Swiss-Prot record:
SUPFAM superfamilies: Histone-fold. Gene3D superfamilies: Histone, subunit A. Binds and compact DNA (95 to 150 base pairs) to form nucleosome-like structures that contain positive DNA supercoils. Increases the resistance of DNA to thermal denaturation (in vitro). One of its GO terms (cellular component) is cytoplasm. Belongs to the archaeal histone HMF family. GO terms for molecular function: DNA binding; protein heterodimerization activity. The keyword Membrane does not apply. Homodimer or heterodimer with another histone. Dimers then assemble into higher oligomers, with the DNA wrapped around the protein core. InterPro entries: Archaeal_histone_HMF (IPR050947), CBFA_NFYB_domain (IPR003958), Histone-fold (IPR009072), HmfB-like (IPR050004). Residues 20-22, 54-57 are annotated as: Interaction with DNA. This is Archaeal histone B.
């Protein structure tokens, strides 16, 4: 884990209204976002395979997010 850069996550927290963000807070949110993204991506891969494709399409991602 730990592949998401901290700076963009820090900016997201600030967009939500925070004036200051600890590095640890940004790291924890980044880890959670990465876990959620991997979960969605795995569902999308399964959907693409089920459709007989190797390529994950935008529809797969959208369906994976909804499920």
């Amino acid at each position: 884990m730990g592949e998401l850069p901290i700076a963009p996550v820090d900016r997201l927290i600030r967009k939500a209204g925070a004036q200051r963000v600890s590095e640890q807070a940004a790291k924890v949110l980044a880890e959670h976002l990465e876990e959620k993204a991997i979960e969605i991506a795995k569902k999308a891969v399964d959907l693409a395979k089920h459709a007989g494709r190797k390529t994950v399409k935008v529809e797969d991602i959208k369906l994976a997010i909804k499920s």
